[in-house]
UniProtKB/Swiss-Prot annotation:
It comes from Cyanidium caldarium (Red alga). One of its GO terms (molecular function) is acyl carrier activity. Residues 5-80 form the Carrier domain. The keyword Plastid applies. Pathway: Lipid metabolism; fatty acid biosynthesis. This is Acyl carrier protein. Keywords: Chloroplast, Fatty acid biosynthesis, Fatty acid metabolism, Lipid biosynthesis, Lipid metabolism, Phosphopantetheine, Phosphoprotein, Plastid. Signal peptide: none annotated. Carrier of the growing fatty acid chain in fatty acid biosynthesis.
Length: 86
């Protein structure tokens, strides 16, 4: 089972890579748009990269609710747990 810390590190890495910024800039409460300068296309690409990395599906409605690293991590944990319990 993947730990929360491992998920956090992977999400930070994805955000860093997608936005072309250093991992040190990607904090747990970093807002993708307000703090890290992501635009709407960046947000779509972040969601797609997260889906691919964790083998999950994120609906458009859910994607709109994910605006920072913490929310992404919590969503991924919920998805993984729901998959395991299905």
């Amino acid at each position: 089972m993947v730990t929360k810390e491992e998920i956090l590190k992977k999400v930070q890495s994805i955000v860093s890579e997608q936005l072309g910024i250093s991992k040190e800039q990607v904090l747990v409460d970093s807002h993708f748009t307000n703090d890290l300068g992501a635009d709407s296309l960046d947000n779509v690409e972040l969601v797609m990269a997260i889906e691919e990395e964790f083998n999950i599906v994120i609906s458009d409605i859910d994607a709109e609710k994910i605006s920072n690293v913490r929310e992404a991590v919590e969503f991924i944990i919920d998805k993984i747990n729901n998959k395991a319990n299905a």
